[in-house]
From Swiss-Prot:
Subcellular location: Cytoplasm
Chief location category: cytoplasm
Function: Involved in the regulation of the intracellular balance of NAD and NADP, and is a key enzyme in the biosynthesis of NADP. Catalyzes specifically the phosphorylation on 2'-hydroxyl of the adenosine moiety of NAD to yield NADP.
Gene that this sequence comes from: nadK
Cited InterPro entries: ATP-NAD_kinase_N, ATP-NAD_kinase_PpnK-typ_C, NAD/diacylglycerol_kinase_sf, NADK
Catalyzed chemical reaction(s): NAD(+) + ATP = ADP + NADP(+) + H(+)
EC number: 2.7.1.23
Name this protein carries in UniProt: NAD kinase
Residues bound to NAD(+): 67-68, 141-142, 152, 169, 171, 182-187, 242
Example GO BP: NADP biosynthetic process
Homology family: Belongs to the NAD kinase family.
Length: 285
């Protein structure tokens, strides 16, 4: 019996409806649905579980929603390489590329072990303050260091493999995976990178020096960013746009390739460039 986890945007009626249908569909095929307690309550499923129980037992994951929902699930499963089926019920869909109409044919392939998977690189992000580790997390998209609401720049020292890169004076800095290249990094002027490439991007946000440009580094790079000066202003580290860490002057953020990857089940009817054309409206006037 295959154990299939279901995650969804809990308060979205459409996601609730698809989740309820999916529970029935899985049970008819002798699969065990794994549903967290919040979603279970909304879809009338009696056997709700904790996220930890689901993470430890799932053999396949279905995410109903948008890219944000999938990214949070990817972090939850960062310690396990479980195939994730991302179903687009949100607005973006760079990651959740499978439509509702494709969901059940794709799941049939998954149950028959004939599905296609792409492995997406993740980043390991650690924050140290003096000798103390204050935060550790894996991210699928990016780690962003930025300032608070006041309009002053911050100074960040960047080192790559212990070699000095530069001091960035900017509104902030984005360190992203190839998957994250179409997120915040793209909005800040970073390049689009094919998601299966192995590399890390550093993209400054509104740098004070115009020659501070985005840079693409080897996936083997270890990047260390030190908060040099914040002008008495709050500085934050945001992980995948969902988890926040308050930083102080002198804090060090170390970023390197994570040992695990996110395994995404791909749509049989789409390719990466088709998704780019659709989402970025290339060729339209």
């Amino acid at each position: 019996m295959k154990q299939v986890a279901i995650f969804a945007k809990v308060h979205d009626p459409r996601c609730q409806g698809v989740a309820s249908e999916l529970v029935t569909w899985l049970e008819e095929r002798k699969c065990l649905p794994l549903v967290d307690t919040h979603l279970a309550r909304h879809v009338g499923y009696a056997r709700g579980l904790t996220e930890k129980q689901i993470r430890d037992r799932a053999e396949l994951v279905v995410v109903l929603g948008g890219d944000g929902t999938l990214i949070s699930v990817a972090r939850l499963f960062s310690s396990r390489q479980v195939p994730i089926v991302g179903v687009n019920l949100g607005s973006l869909g760079f990651l959740t590329e499978i439509t509702v109409e494709q969901l059940y044919p794709v799941l049939e392939q998954c149950l028959a072990d004939s599905h296609r998977i792409t492995e997406r690189m993740m980043l390991d992000v650690t924050v140290t303050r003096g000798d103390q580790e204050i935060s550790h997390c894996q991210v699928l998209n990016d780690a962003v260091i930025n300032k608070g609401a006041l309009a002053r720049i911050i100074e960040l020292e960047a080192r790559v493999n212990d070699d000095f890169l530069t001091n960035f004076k900017a509104d902030g800095l984005i360190i992203s995976t190839p998957t994250g290249s179409t997120g915040y990094s793209l909005s800040a002027g970073g390049p689009i990178v094919q998601p299966l490439m192995k590399c890390v991007l550093i993209t400054p946000i509104c740098p004070h020096t115009l020659t501070n440009r985005p840079i693409v580094l080897s996936y083997q790079s270890v990047i260390r960013i030190t908060v040099k000066s914040s002008f008495d202003e709050m500085v934050y580290l945001t992980l995948d746009g969902q988890v926040g860490v308050e930083l102080q002057e002198g804090d060090c953020i170390e970023v390197s390739r994570a040992e695990t990857t996110t395994a995404l089940v791909t749509s049989p009817e789409k390719d990466y460039f088709a998704i780019l054309r659709a989402k970025l409206k290339w060729g339209e006037r």
